[in-house]
From Swiss-Prot:
It comes from Haemophilus influenzae (strain PittGG). Catalyzes the deamination of dCTP to dUTP. It is an enzyme of class 3 (hydrolase). Disulfide bonds: none annotated. Pathway: Pyrimidine metabolism; dUMP biosynthesis; dUMP from dCTP (dUTP route): step 1/2. Its EC number is 3.5.4.13. Keywords: Hydrolase, Nucleotide metabolism, Nucleotide-binding. The lineage of its organism: Bacteria, Pseudomonadati, Pseudomonadota, Gammaproteobacteria, Pasteurellales. GO terms for biological process: dUMP biosynthetic process; dUTP biosynthetic process; nucleobase-containing small molecule interconversion. DCTP binds at residues 110-115, 128, 136-138, 171, 178, 182. This is dCTP deaminase. SUPFAM superfamilies: dUTPase-like (SSF51283).
Length: 195
């Protein structure tokens, strides 16, 4: 069952779901709560690698990823990050999210931004039960013009569903949880996948 605005408010008030900093109640709409853009970004550097072999030896995949991904870029308050057409970038939500083992979250982009060509999450919009940390956004500009993205702007909305029971393996206790407690735009850790 997806939570309605009344339940989202109650779950936040009771500490069942946590968003830090907590958005004002006027950011809770029907069945979602707005989340804002943080100030941490990563982009792909100019590179000459013809491809990344995602199924290659872990050491090679790790080296290839390291060679193409930038260090963390922090955008100061009031300044903009420019996402150019055809470009992929990673960013974070301003809010850190904490979910219990019986609730799953979903991130959706804003229709108004999508109409300008901005994809807020390329494919990864599920927030696992037991998640704790900021949400990394996979931005892609499929439009024709550069887009100026500023920290604190509303970037998407979260919705929540109560599971049929408590997850046996919530994200918070999984030993293979690669992005546990992330607070910045963490690059892909596909090289840490188990065989």
């Amino acid at each position: 069952m997806r939570l309605c605005d009344t339940d989202i408010e109650r779950y936040l008030d009771d500490g069942i779901i946590s968003l830090t900093p907590r958005p004002n109640n006027d950011k809770i709409n029907g069945a979602t709560i707005d989340v804002r853009l943080g100030n941490s970004f990563r982009v792909f550097r100019e590179h000459s690698a013809p491809f990344i072999d995602l199924s290659g030896p872990k050491e090679e995949v790790s080296a290839q990823l390291e060679s193409v991904m930038s260090d963390e870029i922090i955008i100061p308050e009031g300044e903009a990050f420019f996402l150019h057409p055809g470009t992929l970038a990673l960013a974070t939500t301003l809010e850190s999210v904490k979910l219990p083992a019986n609730i799953i979250g979903w991130l959706d982009g804003r229709s108004s931004l999508a109409r300008l060509g901005l994809m807020v999450h390329v494919t990864a919009h599920r927030i696992d039960p037991g998640w704790e940390g900021k949400i990394v956004l996979e931005f892609y500009n499929s439009g024709k013009l550069p887009l100026a993205l500023r920290p604190n702007m509303v970037i998407g909305a979260l919705s929540f569903e109560v599971l049929s029971g408590e997850a046996k393996r919530p994200y918070s206790i999984r030993k293979d949880a690669k992005y546990k407690n992330q607070q910045s735009a963490v690059a892909s850790r596909i090289d840490e996948d188990k065989e």
